[in-house]
């Protein structure tokens, strides 16, 4: 594991992303509003619907055949003359129109009608400006603003500080580029676009930060102007802040010393002092008075800066901080590049335009499937009917799921929680699917996993459980995605041509998987166009009924190890029983319509249904749960996970693994103070406290003289939480769970700070592994694991499974 994460092949994939992006329809100019005048257009949307006030209307959208610009307007039915003019206008109608604007609203007159065509014009994708990928970030103060852009390929920086003209020139020279940010769709993009339109960036920034009303933000500038093509790395990866990702990746996570709430322009105090012959050697009060006089800043504010040794170059510090965030975003971009290419690929496959890339995966999926938002149907709790062909024997299951309407839980959704005690495991059925497992279980020998292929997507198509918000003429799309994914999966081609772009087959498969795996969740999201809680419930229940049906058929011939949403792991009693299960599985496939994979394994070490290590027949290691650190994303105490995995499945002594490890990033422990707390403080060995940042990188150390302790503070509140002490009226909660006895903070880039390998307390990390072993396998863990190792003919490779 490198001190700073590296992602080989990222630049090649970024080039492919840019190629796909450039082939999506649209350029910056084509998304500008259609200008007043006479235009040759084609109608690309003609939809009758109700207005927000319930009035009958028709939404018309036309596209210029010259430059691809669009105009959208609404014809109200009660305006009889207008309605008569537009009532029979349909999609594909060619028109010559005159466009005028009245208070910003388009007024369209038809000059001439042409033929109706089938092939609607796409927006031109030829770039009219420089086209590249920019990584960017912005910092906005009340009287200061900073924009930092970095060309991903040339690594050239563009820094724009308090210069609106320069920002507009940069935009006009690069508007056909792809802009990558972190939380940029909600924040950076809106602030930048509003600023270019002459709005106050600070006011827009505050509205975004302080208000939950998105509509308020969009009223502050014209969302139809200054289009910015972008992808937001935060959008579909909620849960971790950019600072946390920076910490996991090993780079500098120091927060800026500049106060974002300051009510003045940023100042280079060193320059001011030099210009006016002032020195920090002067008497503090005299220096304060002089600086206040020459800058015009309130004397109390200046005094705090003088006393706090904060007379720094604020502009440079802010630029350094912003550049550091851009570099962090760039590294996260490289880490996530595969998903971004998959997203762009599916947009290209469906012929969407460049703005589709700024959508969340859920909204993009709704767009692909043509979903139209509907009123709630109120049928979620209706009685469930088991599909034909299913064979459930359990009366307990029938009573819980098929006897009548469902009860409503506290969130207003159907309550479907049930525990069923079986011979080997207790099966838990609920909104998360079927789950059950033998706890603290170790087995060495041949066993199988029967895994249902694409359980939820196939449930939707087999039983017509797709969202009812998908129009009839789009119902085939979901099945087509399933079919095309399977076709690509079994293709022997390295690349497949999609609209003139050669896409690596693996990336195309991931592109198809994106909407397939997103649809189920979107059907339960109230603000998504696919929202259909009844169909989502039917998918959830039917998937569990299918798995329970299969469970009942396997049980007489095998020991069940675990059930996990779409699979059963089991040990056949004999070779004959294994053959019998194969026969029953084929019958199950025929009855239900699903397909089953049969994956062979040769060892499993299982804490519970959500935490296990398994060795496949070909010696690969499959792991699930916290030990995997969010699939290697959350690099915190990685050496503990790696030592644990290598000891349990590969027989490598965990003490030796840790003592031999010379990779500092494996030893980092990342702590974060959540939003429910007011402050983070650090206490040194002498009991002195000072304010600390929310995200910190700490290491266990041997020397107590350098140790500190982090606390999360709730002001004026008494909290009853483990690890919490009361200090006056405040609650102090330990900021590092399972903390070392002694630790220090080092928020510099790993390898450039104060921590070195010789300072580490490696015994702490060894003890953490032993705590995990007890948690998984009990106090006799050593005997159990050594017994398992004695039965293993060969071990998997010793390596960093978290890397």
Task: Give names to the regions the model predicted.
Residues 125-126, 139, 247-257, 262-458, ...:
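Conserved "right-hand" nucleotidyltransferase catalytic core of DNA-directed polymerases
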Residues 149-244, 259-261, 289-294:
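Conserved DEDDh/DEDDy metal-dependent 3′-5′ exonuclease domain
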Residues 80-98:
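Short nucleic-acid-contacting surface segments enriched for D/E, G, S/T with interspersed K/R
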Residues 35-52, 133:
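Structural detector for short beta-strands of small beta-barrel domains
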Residues 100-121:
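OB-fold/S1-family single-stranded nucleic acid-binding modules
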Residues 509, 578-803:
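C-terminal, non-catalytic extensions of nucleic-acid polymerases
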Residues 180-182, 189-190, 391-529, 791-794:
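Catalytic nucleotidyl-transfer cores of nucleotide-processing enzymes
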Residues 51-78:
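OB-fold (S1/OB) nucleic-acid-binding surfaces
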């Amino acid at each position: 594991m490198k001190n700073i994460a590296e992602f080989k092949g990222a630049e090649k994939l970024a080039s492919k992303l840019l190629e796909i992006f450039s082939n999506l329809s649209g350029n910056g100019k084509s998304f500008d509003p259609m200008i007043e005048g006479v235009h040759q257009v084609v109608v690309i949307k003609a939809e009758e619907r109700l207005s927000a006030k319930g009035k009958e209307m028709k939404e018309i959208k036309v596209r210029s055949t010259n430059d691809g610009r669009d105009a959208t307007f609404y014809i109200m039915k009660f305006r009889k003359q207008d309605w008569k003019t537009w009532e029979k206008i349909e999609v594909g109608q060619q028109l010559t129109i005159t466009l005028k604007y009245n208070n910003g609203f388009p007024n369209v007159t038809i000059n001439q009608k042409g033929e109706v065509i089938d092939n609607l014009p796409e927006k031109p994708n030829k770039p009219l400006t420089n086209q590249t990928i920019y990584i960017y970030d912005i910092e906005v103060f009340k009287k200061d603003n900073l924009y930092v852009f970095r060309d991903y390929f040339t690594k050239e920086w563009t820094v724009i500080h308090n210069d609106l003209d320069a920002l507009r020139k940069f935009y006009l020279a690069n508007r056909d580029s792809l802009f990558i940010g972190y939380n940029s769709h909600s924040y950076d993009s809106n602030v930048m676009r509003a600023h270019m339109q002459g709005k106050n960036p600070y006011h827009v920034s505050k509205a975004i930060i302080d208000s939950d009303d998105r509509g308020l933000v969009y009223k502050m500038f014209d969302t139809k102007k200054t289009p910015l093509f972008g992808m937001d790395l935060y959008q579909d990866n909620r849960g971790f802040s950019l600072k946390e990702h920076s910490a996991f990746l090993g780079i500098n996570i120091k927060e800026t010393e500049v106060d974002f709430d300051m009510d003045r322009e940023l100042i280079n105090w060193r320059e001011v002092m030099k210009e006016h012959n002032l020195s920090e050697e002067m008497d503090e009060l005299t220096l304060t008075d002089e600086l206040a006089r020459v800058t015009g800043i309130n004397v109390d504010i200046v005094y705090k800066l003088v006393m706090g040794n904060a007379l720094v170059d604020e502009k440079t510090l802010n630029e350094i901080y912003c550049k550091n965030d851009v570099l962090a975003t760039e590294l996260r971009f490289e880490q996530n590049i595969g998903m971004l290419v998959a997203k762009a690929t599916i947009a290209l496959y469906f012929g969407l335009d460049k703005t589709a890339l700024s959508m969340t995966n859920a909204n993009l999926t709704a767009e692909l499937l043509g979903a139209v938002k509907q009123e709630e149907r109120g049928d979620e709790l209706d009685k469930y009917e088991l599909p034909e062909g299913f064979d459930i024997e359990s009366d307990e299951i029938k009573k819980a799921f098929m006897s009548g309407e469902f009860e409503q839980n506290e969130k207003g959704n159907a309550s479907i929680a049930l525990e069923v005690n079986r011979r080997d495991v207790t099966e838990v059925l609920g909104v998360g699917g079927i789950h059950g497992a033998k706890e603290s279980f170790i087995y060495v020998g041949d066993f199988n996993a029967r895994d249902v292929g694409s359980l939820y997507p196939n449930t939707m198509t087999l039983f017509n459980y797709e969202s009812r918000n998908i129009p009839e003429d789009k119902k085939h799309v979901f099945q087509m995605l399933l079919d095309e994914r399977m076709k690509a999966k079994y293709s022997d081609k390295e690349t497949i041509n999609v609209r003139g772009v050669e896409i690596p087959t693996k990336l195309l498969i991931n592109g198809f998987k994106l909407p397939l795996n997103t649809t189920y969740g979107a059907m339960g999201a109230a603000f998504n166009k696919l929202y259909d809680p009844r169909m989502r419930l039917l998918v959830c229940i039917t998937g569990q009924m299918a798995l329970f049906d299969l469970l009942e058929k396997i049980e007489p011939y095998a020991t069940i190890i675990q059930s996990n949403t779409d699979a059963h792991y089991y040990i056949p009693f004999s070779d004959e029983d294994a053959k019998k299960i194969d026969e029953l599985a084929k019958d199950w496939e025929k009855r239900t319509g699903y397909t089953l994979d049969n994956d062979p394994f040769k060892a499993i070490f299982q804490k519970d249904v959500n935490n296990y290590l398994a060795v496949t027949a070909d010696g690969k290691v499959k792991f699930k749960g916290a030990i995997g650190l969010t699939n290697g994303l959350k690099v915190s105490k990685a050496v503990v996970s790696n030592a644990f995995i290598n000891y349990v499945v590969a027989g490598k002594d965990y003490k030796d693994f840790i003592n031999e490890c010379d990779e500092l990033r494996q030893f980092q422990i990342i702590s974060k103070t959540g939003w429910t707390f007011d402050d983070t403080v650090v206490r040194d060995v002498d009991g002195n406290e000072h304010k600390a940042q929310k995200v910190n990188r700490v290491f266990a150390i041997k020397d107590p003289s350098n140790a500190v302790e982090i606390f999360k503070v709730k002001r004026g509140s008494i909290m009853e939480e483990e690890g919490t002490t009361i200090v006056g009226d405040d609650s102090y909660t330990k900021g590092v769970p399972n903390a070392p006895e002694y630790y220090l903070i080092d928020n510099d880039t790993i390898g450039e700070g104060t921590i070195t390998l010789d300072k580490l307390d490696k015994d702490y990390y060894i003890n953490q592994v032993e705590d995990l072993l007890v948690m998984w396998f009990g106090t006799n863990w050593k005997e159990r694991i050594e017994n398992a190792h004695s039965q293993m003919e060969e071990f998997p490779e010793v390596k960093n499974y978290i890397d």
